[in-house]
């Protein structure tokens, strides 16, 4: 099976932007400067601009945005801190860029269990600053102050990987929003269970 992609029609994009603006107000941005800022990471690849940048603040908002974009067949690009070297931020067909910088809370720290719960926009440096008082540290260091969401998406590693593993070994569970807008939860805080 061959998948073909094409740029959405101007009508579909305009209707989607209008819907997003109605729901998220000034957190829906279409200025050239903001779109250009969100069109590339640290890599050298050149690509097109997203049609709009939206700043969600909750998983439910992301679910609603993805549901809308899925129905209109509008591409979506997630944006953490823009440190990607791999071209993840390329808006080849325009679309909606989800800037997760407003989802940057450390929700829970369980020092006794050596774990914590964070939102996708939390950066590596922010997490380490927030848990430092417990004597813990987050060992993944890809060299940039990347977001936890971006590091998870790329299975980041770094200079400490030999001793502490990659992102894969340092995540117990995820809350994920699927392209059709469903919110699913994977994993548990339990390190070992009857399920493995």
Task: Provide a role label for each language-model segment.
Residues 74-75, 137:
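Residue-level detector of anion-binding/catalytic polar loops
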Residues 29-30, 78, 140:
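Short beta-strand
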Residues 105-109, 116-196:
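FAD-binding subdomain of flavoenzyme oxidoreductases
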């Amino acid at each position: 099976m061959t998948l073909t992609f094409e740029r959405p029609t101007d009508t579909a994009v305009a209707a989607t932007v209008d819907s997003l603006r109605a729901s998220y107000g000034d957190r829906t941005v279409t200025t050239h400067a903001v779109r250009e800022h969100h069109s590339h990471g640290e890599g050298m690849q050149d690509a097109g601009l997203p049609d709009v940048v939206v700043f969600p603040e909750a998983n439910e908002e992301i679910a609603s945005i993805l549901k809308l974009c899925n129905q209109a067949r509008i591409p979506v690009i997630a944006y953490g801190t823009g440190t990607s070297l791999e071209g993840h931020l390329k808006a080849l067909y325009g679309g909606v860029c989800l800037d997760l910088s407003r989802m940057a809370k450390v929700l829970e720290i369980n020092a006794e269990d050596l774990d914590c719960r964070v939102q996708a926009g939390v950066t590596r440096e922010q997490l380490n600053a927030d848990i430092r008082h417990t004597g813990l540290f987050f060992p993944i260091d890809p060299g940039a102050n990347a977001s936890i969401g971006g590091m998870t998406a790329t299975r980041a590693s770094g200079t400490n990987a030999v001793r502490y593993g990659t992102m894969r070994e340092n995540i117990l569970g995820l809350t994920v929003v699927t392209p059709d807008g469903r919110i699913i939860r994977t994993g548990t805080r339990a390190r070992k269970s009857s399920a493995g």
